[in-house]
């Protein structure tokens, strides 16, 4: 990390992330004293803080600039006719209300954090670490905004599936998400299949598969699919994806970010076994744990391709949620876990502060612009 590359925007972004962390910690301190949270309004400090920190960004990441034109085309009636209907409807309603693109960015940030708080409100005693980790881990959502806007509805539906096995409400909310972004169909199917697993995944088996993926998986298998995908007739809506299949499915044509460090390796090992112990004591976490384990195993593969990153990222968020549950449970039930687990709580808290607050703010080559940096510009340029 090059310390000389820090700019005013990096420093300001760091303080905003730190401010968000403090607000969320204060908020959950009050909420965690109750056994059940009936009203989502109790999360208003978290919702407001995240909405402002995320929603007031400008020109970043890439999709912010692309969707500025998509949004205005739809509002003016010049947009493509085969856009997802619910996304088009939301944009047209926002446009009719006089909302510009920046206002819609704020709206999407609000919907995402509200859905997350709605999902987590049923676990008030475990929110101390899980809600801060959830909020701080949503950085990638800023790059694939429409994907996460749709997933916000899927997440609300998932809360009914987790707590009450209510598949009807899950399907209804998932359809809302699907009609915002058709690509979520894969996530919806995966979530349904994973939630059918009634037992926590064996940590030893999970770890062995994870190691095999790290050591032996070759991305060339996806490159071979490119020619096949480009020849399948699945309608004009996906024509651009098919035409660019080689780009989406060939790791050599993208920047590879799929390196897994030693600490991440140790972290996943701890998560597999610690999460399994948590689920053995509290079965209500089994579905979330299984989603997170599969996301961890798939992570080294997914990080090689943007399309797979999108699919895996909304599953990977459950690692942070369940890890927050696990670390909190270790503090609440010290005698249930090995003694060294308590020391690891401190280690992981420091690590997450570094990786999600400090490192995210000061990555090389990243300028974290906000609306006051626009200087009259509508976008950063493409």
Q: For each predicted feature, which ranges?
A:
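TM-lumen/periplasm interface segments of multi-pass membrane proteins
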Residues: 1-9, 13, 31-108, 355-382
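Alpha-helical transmembrane segments and terminal signal-anchor/GPI-anchor hydrophobic tails
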Residues: 41, 60, 65-69, 74, ...
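Transmembrane-helix signature of polytopic, membrane-embedded enzymes
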Residues: 117-135
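Membrane-interface alpha helices of multi-pass inner-membrane proteins
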Residues: 137-139, 169-193, 296-300
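Short acidic/glycine- and proline-prone juxtamembrane loop motifs at membrane-interface regions
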Residues: 142-149
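Membrane-interface transmembrane helices that cradle and orient dolichyl/undecaprenyl
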Residues: 154-168
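Signature aromatic-anchored transmembrane alpha helix within multi-pass, membrane-resident enzymes
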Residues: 207-212, 332-354
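Hydrophobic/aromatic-rich transmembrane helices and adjacent perimembrane loops
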Residues: 309-326
